[in-house]
Amino acid sequence: MTARGSVERLTSSSGEPAWLVSGYELVKELLADPRLSRSHADPRHPVRMTQPALFGGPMGDPDAEREDHVRMRRLLTRSFSARRMESLRPRIDRIVGQVLDGMETGGSPADFHAAVSFPLPGLVMCELLGISEPDRADFLRWSEDAIHMEHPARSRAGLQSLWRCLGATIERKHAAAGEDVISDMLAAGMADPAMSDDAIAHLASGLLFAGHGSTAAVIDRGILLLLTHTKEREALQRSPGLAPQAVEEILRCPSPLERPRANRRGGLPRYASVDLEAGGVRIRAGDLVMFALQDANEDAGTFRHPAHFDVARQENPHLAFSHGLHFCLGASVARMELQLLFGQLLGQFPMLHLDVPLEQLRAKAERSPGRAVEIPVAW
């Protein structure tokens, strides 16, 4: 352990040995270290972080991972450009309005997770990817199944259904392109032989999972933080222009449903491509390394009063979207939908409150830390 952080041995959720990196400076440094990658030299026998079909183990070719990743980001530059994001804003705003109106029409009380947190980011990703509206309900259900951490068979079945849907969508886009990510990738693929339909489906599924399950967890976290911190909720309600700062603080802070800080496990699996030293310990090639992002985001050496939820916090260099080569490509989309949601929510539902004590809520541990089984609310 050093003043900049620590690297400790632990057992991953899959029951296998791993290293856990803690501390803001060390986490940030190692996230940008090219010796730690998402691929593994022996992908058939790696240590796994969790058991879901998509995210629990390695991804990519160890001999070409960096080159492939740089090419992928270059191909998607147009899809996530400032111009495209601004063109998306009214469409995302419409989806936010439809989701909130749907909860209001359903009446009080409601399950906020089922009415808002789960459908909203999935619908936004469907809009971004170009998934047809008739397919979206099934698409969201398969997405939920695919990230089941405790049921590998269900996870695999959900992933296979998603791939079939993506394949059909790609076929349609070959015939009639639109202003969406899949169409952009098909156009870029005309000049890049490596961009096969399977490669495009793989990239699209990665974008979906990055933008759906994780953003649903942030929305769950955000509503619970706001409804359990009266002064901060009132500040945002009085000044919806605080939504950008509030969203950054929601991204930084832990959910009220998460374990105490000392008991949290890490996320973001990486594999050492060579032997290396970090935090005073020796990490061997092939070892699984995980990052305690939440610990880093509460590091008192970086954040003033880190345990305080402050919707007006000004300096907030959190690592919720990772850092370095693998910084979240869809961060701008996630920020936009979160800002639109939390900028509108309390104006439309000024009396919104939890309908049960916080202690009665249960985290959805088998899917994503901090996500709730349900969030009963009333207004």
Residue ranges, per PLM feature:
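Cytochrome P450
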Residues: M1-W379
